[in-house]
A protein has these predicted regions:
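Phosphate-binding/switch region of NTP-binding enzymes
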Residues: 170-174, 178-236
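Detector for small/aliphatic-rich hydrophobic stretches
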Residues: 1-87, 101-104, 121-131, 135, ...
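Short, solvent-exposed loop/turn segments at secondary-structure junctions
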Residues: 161-166, 197-199
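Amphipathic alpha-helical transducer elements in NTP-driven molecular machines
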Residues: 37-40, 53, 68, 132-140, ...
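Conserved inter-motif catalytic segment of the P-loop NTP-binding fold
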Residues: 62, 73, 81-164
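Hydrophobic/aromatic beta-strand patches that form the interior of the parallel beta-sheet core
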Residues: 57-59, 86-88, 110-112, 189, ...
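Amphipathic alpha-helical interface segments used for dimerization/assembly
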Residues: 75, 142, 185-188
Length: 236
């Protein structure tokens, strides 16, 4: 991310007072405050209420498996509760029209857009170069947002980034990001085609064909692992 873009993002966060503002949901039970519900009943039941705050989690699966729909549902729920959310979208793949129809309130969402994947300068199959730079910028933007605080849910969409490119990032990248949000009210979620990283207290929601999902904690697949995600919630 160019220095001017970094400066602008930091200025924007300060202007909106998101660099020190904590999300407001104090009237909820203590346990509920530390979870971000996905809004999908069967999945939230398996998650014991939702995605844990203060941790790095992931939603993974092939294209059209419903991975993005799970996240959009969580974003919609968070904004409806009055929380600020953020999406780091390095390849500009997000569909705001569909998200708005699903209930996402864009007045409460910071959308950080990278260069469109359709651009001649970006190739989803390239091994290095522009795509790697897009990923590096996305990680820098993610770090700035997490450092700012005040977000209930922060998502980075790496679903269309080749795993070979993602694996070039040092694993310490994810460790450092988790340390930023550890103990905070922010849940950070990675979207990927395959598992990328999660903190010890985070979860992996693994989507499969037929809108089936399974939840993985502490490197173990939970018993009764498959949860049916309704088609309406996994349409994108």
């Amino acid at each position: 991310m160019p220095a001017t873009a970094v400066d602008y993002l930091e200025s924007l966060l300060r202007t909106r007072k998101l660099d020190h503002t904590l999300t407001g949901f104090r009237s909820e039970p203590a346990e509920a405050r530390w979870l971000v519900p996905t809004g999908i009943t069967a999945l939230d039941a398996r998650l014991d209420g939702g995605i844990p705050r203060g941790h790095l989690s992931e939603v993974v699966g092939p294209r059209s498996s419903g991975r993005l729909a799970v996240v959009v549902s969580a974003l919609a729920g968070a904004t409806s509760r009055g929380e600020a959310v953020a999406l780091v979208d390095p390849l500009d793949m997000f569909d705001p029209v569909s998200a708005s129809a699903s209930g996402v309130d864009f007045q409460r969402m910071l959308w950080i857009r990278g260069e469109a994947a359709s651009s001649a300068r970006v190739s989803l199959s390239c091994e290095y170069g522009t795509l790697q730079k897009s990923l590096d910028r996305a990680v820098k933007a993610l770090n700035i947002v997490l450092q700012a605080g005040g977000f209930g849910l922060v998502v980075v969409d790496l679903g269309e980034v080749a795993m070979t490119t993602i694996k070039r990032l040092p694993y310490t990248t994810w460790v450092r990001l988790h340390r930023v949000i550890e103990g905070s009210e922010t849940a950070c979620v990675l979207i990927g085609s395959e598992p990328i990283a999660r903190s010890a207290g985070g979860v992996t929601i693994q989507m499969a064909a037929g809108q089936n999902a399974r939840v993985i904690r502490a490197r173990k697949v939970e018993s009764d692992q498959h949860v049916r995600v309704p088609l309406s919630a996994a349409a994108c």
